[in-house]
Amino acid sequence: MKFDVIIIGAGSAGMQVATALQKAGRKTAVIGLGRSINEVEVRPYERKGGTLLIGDSVCEGLFEDGRLKAVRTANLGAYPLEAERFVLATGKFLGGGLVADMERVYEPLFGLDVAWDKDRSRWFDADFGAPQPFLRFGLETDAQSRPSLSGRTVENLYACGEILAGVSAVDGREAIAASAAKVLSILTEEGHAEA
């Protein structure tokens, strides 16, 4: 199955991008586990015919020449979902966008490069009410909101929302919305959407 844009993550940032692209006439799909679904944004998207794969998860990315060509999901198995562009909006730790173990912090879907402090003792502040440093971990992107894989930019993958380094819902929703708006603007400027 081929789409113009596949959005991975059905939270606020992912649904903001999906809804705007759908209104612009783009064929989109949203894949989300359902951990942080924004029901207010999902319902109109679904009513207008958006492809919504809730309860499914990406289990493999198929890369070729620095581009993500398709993804395989747990529920669709051998049937890849292809797109010209992909948007990653999976959140941080609670949404499953980042995972931490005793040695590292990593992005579990594609193994994208993550900005994090290697000194585990600096991951937190003992004052529970203080800003927690681990909430600043995430993907660093280029000026076009594209993350990197092993130091190389993935040309057609864009990241927005809490998955980004320095963005946290603790600070308010403005930064999340702004990152989604930036990705939408970039897709629009490239001629991949009309907003």
Language-model features, listed with the residues they occupy:
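Residues forming the flavin
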Residues: 1-195
